[in-house]
């Protein structure tokens, strides 16, 4: 899978390969061949999203090659909030964390480009099998499958646009690609068209693909009830609309778009029936951030069955500091400055180890936790992401963690920001205060950001501080930081970041504008002159 042209065949092959590891295998003895094929295509998409060796580089030892969870870890590594607390020689995400080797010639570009276009082709394959000319003529199964496919495709294009749109920054200039997103591939796209497929305008991708797909998904899933948190639901569609309208609001400085974001965020909260994580659920040493069924907060997540777990190619091996099965421990922790910005009355602070280990009775799945936390883990190391089922010594069990893609808490943050951005600053302050006081403060403590929110800018800075804490490690906030032109800082006196990671970026980071891989520009030469500048090495590490 080196370019879009090759992805159609690859997607078909991947679907067949994945069908064997999908839970609840297709009942071929009672289904028609067409039904089996369609169901296999639909079920193959979420299985592909957690597949290792999805780009083919894992077979060469690239331990970053495990699909969407790896993408989330890559973007998180670019924020400045995540630091490596162990042996940096074993950090497989060092390119993203240190801004090296991110140009078109490097394999890491396949993680986003090849994967997303493979998944888009899989969604297209479902869409082209169902006659969408009249939704009312479809049966319930066809409606749900088509709704899933539209939701998936919208989500994939939304991510691609947010990754690859060139946004102005202080380090690179590319006026010729301003306003451009990515090539659009639809079921009707021919091979000849794919060979001459320029980057579409961002506005067109939103107006002609993302929003129409989400509208279709909303209509098709209006009366559908998802059986579990692993299945696309109407609430997820509303959540994707909230994300998309928030992006449009900022890009266009459009109060109406912000109002739409707030409205859809509230609809997602209502439709999901979800409630934010409790302190007990957040700190659960067995199920913390690894199980869709152990809480009421997840809107949508991905299951990684144990038979599909590879030792070094899963999210848990890189993000859980408690596991014992890896031959190395790069370890991930929080930026020291960000840690000390967390209110001591906020239970989220317990996600990372304080230098004074006796400051809190940290929970763990390990019987030797007290000694292990003191002697084996660095200060500020995270214990947010737990080995599945608490199996810290068995990668087949402990690595088989569910992966969260949307929590209801994100909708509370979108609603608060969008309300303020739309002109109701007092309303945004009230919403953030209510969320934090009701769901994050301990022992009856009250959170009040009023004194920090005299201006809209002040409020957004405070909201983003809380959002960065809330979603640390989950692959959410880089998109917000890019959207809002935020700075990041790992270099300062007392930093806990290794020397090569101490990047201080004023405003939007140049490496948040992802570069299209060379194999694509070779096979689709019209975009060879439309690529984003290579940001590698443009930000020198802070020397002190």
Residue ranges and their predicted role:
Residues 343-408:
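Flexible, polar/acidic helix-loop-strand segments at domain edges
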């Amino acid at each position: 899978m080196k370019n879009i042209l090759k992805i159609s065949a690859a997607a078909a092959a991947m679907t067949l390969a994945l069908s064997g590891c999908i839970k609840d295998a297709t009942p071929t003895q009672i289904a028609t061949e067409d039904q089996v094929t369609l169901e296999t295509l639909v079920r193959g998409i979420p299985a592909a999203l957690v597949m290792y060796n999805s780009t083919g580089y894992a077979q060469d030892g690239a331990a970053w090659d495990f699909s969407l969870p790896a993408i989330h870890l890559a973007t998180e590594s670019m924020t400045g909030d995540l630091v490596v607390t162990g042996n940096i020689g074993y950090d497989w995400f060092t390119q993203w964390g240190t801004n090296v080797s991110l140009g078109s010639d490097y394999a890491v570009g396949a993680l986003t480009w090849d994967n997303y276009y493979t998944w888009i082709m899989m969604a297209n394959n479902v869409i082209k099998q169902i006659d969408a000319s009249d939704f009312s003529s479809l049966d319930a199964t066809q409606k749900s499958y088509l709704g899933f496919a539209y939701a998936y495709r919208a989500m994939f294009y939304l991510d691609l646009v947010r990754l690859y749109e060139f946004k102005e920054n202080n380090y690179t200039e590319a006026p010729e690609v301003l306003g451009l997103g990515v090539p659009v591939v639809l079921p009707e796209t021919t091979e000849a068209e794919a060979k001459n497929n320029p980057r579409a305008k961002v506005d067109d991708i939103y107006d002609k693909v993302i929003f129409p797909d989400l509208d279709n998904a909303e209509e098709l899933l209006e009366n559908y009830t998802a059986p579990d948190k692993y299945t696309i639901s109407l609430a997820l569609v509303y959540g994707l609309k909230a994300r998309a309208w928030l992006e449009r609001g900022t890009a266009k400085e459009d109060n109406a778009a912000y109002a739409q974001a707030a409205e859809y965020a509230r609809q997602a909260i209502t439709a999901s029936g979800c409630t934010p994580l409790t302190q007990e659920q957040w700190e659960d040493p067995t199920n913390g951030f690894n199980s869709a069924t152990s809480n009421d907060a997840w809107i949508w997540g991905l299951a990684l069955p144990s038979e599909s777990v590879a030792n070094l190619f899963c999210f848990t091996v890189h993000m859980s500091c408690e596991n014992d099965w890896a031959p190395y421990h790069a370890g991930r922790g929080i930026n020291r400055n960000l840690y000390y910005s967390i209110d001591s009355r906020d239970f989220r602070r317990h996600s990372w180890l304080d230098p004074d280990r006796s400051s809190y009775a940290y929970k763990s799945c390990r019987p030797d936790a007290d000694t292990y936390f003191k002697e084996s883990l660095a200060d500020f190391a995270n214990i947010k992401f737990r080995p599945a089922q608490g199996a810290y010594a068995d990668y087949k069990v402990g690595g088989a963690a569910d992966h969260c893609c949307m929590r209801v808490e994100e909708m509370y943050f979108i609603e608060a920001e969008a309300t303020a951005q739309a002109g109701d600053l007092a309303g945004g302050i009230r919403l953030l205060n209510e969320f934090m006081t009701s769901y994050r403060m301990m022992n009856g403590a009250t959170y009040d950001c009023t004194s920090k929110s005299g201006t809209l800018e002040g409020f957004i800075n405070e909201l983003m501080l809380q959002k960065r804490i809330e979603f640390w490690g989950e692959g959410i906030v880089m998109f917000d930081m890019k959207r809002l032109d935020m700075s990041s800082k790992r270099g300062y006196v007392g930093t806990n970041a290794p020397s090569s990671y101490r990047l201080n970026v004023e405003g939007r980071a140049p490496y948040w504008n992802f570069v299209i891989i060379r194999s694509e520009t070779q096979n689709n030469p019209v975009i060879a002159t439309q690529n984003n500048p290579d940001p590698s090495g443009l930000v020198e590490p802070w020397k002190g």
